Each structure stands twice: as structure tokens, then as C-alpha cells.
Amino acid sequence: MIQQESQLKVADNTGAKKVKCFKVLGGSRRRYATVGDIIVCSVRDVEPDSSIKKGDVVKAVIVRTRRDILRKDGSSLRFDTNSCVIIDEKGNPKGTRIFGPIAREIRDRGFVKISSLAPEVI
């Protein structure tokens, strides 16, 4: 569960390392976001010589959460970190690589490009 002020790691090669969520999209007073939801973030930490600068406002899709993801078959899934992938206005990832596994719910939500770039879909 991601909410305002939550800090997330960035799981792609755009150059951003950490972002802070300041808006959960999808409703007038929506409080929490989970895997597959879009959030608006501020970049807090970047790698040197990256195209994204500290303080930039970006949209991102959540790909991993520490909170359990409950599935229809009764199983649950949990990751070690809260992570996201930075996207453009059309919903395509800005980076060309994605690091670490992602949840299957990403593909179900329509982010096929992100799931195809990931090394492992759980």
C-alpha cells in the first residue's frame, strides 16, 4: 500500500534511484495505491549524468510492494521493497531495462511493455 509521502525505489534505468509519492491517481480522494496503479512522484535521488533531474515530477507504475498482494486463487505474494517504473504520458516505460521481478498484475492492468522488459514475472 502506497500513499502520500511514501518513498519508493525506481526499478528501471532512467537514472532516478528514489522517488516520493505525492498523489495517487484514480479518484478524487483515493488514499492508497497497490501494484499496477499509477502515482505522481517527485524524484528525490538520481545517478550522475542522468536525463532525469532531482525534483522532477514524473508518473510511475507500482511494480512491487511490501504489502501482500492477494490473488483470486487464494495465494498471496509479497516483495522486499516498494518499487516503481517511471512512465511517459502514453503509459510506456521511459527506461529500456527493468531490474528485478515484477508481479503478474502489471500485465493484467495493461502494461504489457513493462512486463515484457522485466527479467521475471511472478
From Swiss-Prot:
InterPro entries: Ribosomal_uL14, Ribosomal_uL14_bac-type, Ribosomal_uL14_CS, Ribosomal_uL14_sf
Keywords: Ribonucleoprotein, Ribosomal protein, RNA-binding, rRNA-binding
Biological process, per Gene Ontology: translation
A Pfam family: Ribosomal_L14
GO cellular component: cytosolic large ribosomal subunit
Domain of life: Bacteria
GO molecular function, one term: structural constituent of ribosome
SMART domains: Ribosomal_L14
Entry keyword annotation includes RNA-binding: yes
Keyword field contains Ribosomal protein: yes
Role according to the record: Binds to 23S rRNA. Forms part of two intersubunit bridges in the 70S ribosome.
NCBIfam families cross-referenced by the UniProt entry: rplN_bact (TIGR01067)
Family from the record: Belongs to the universal ribosomal protein uL14 family.
Subunit: Part of the 50S ribosomal subunit. Forms a cluster with proteins L3 and L19. In the 70S ribosome, L14 and L19 interact and together make contacts with the 16S rRNA in bridges B5 and B8.
Name the UniProt record assigns to this protein: Large ribosomal subunit protein uL14
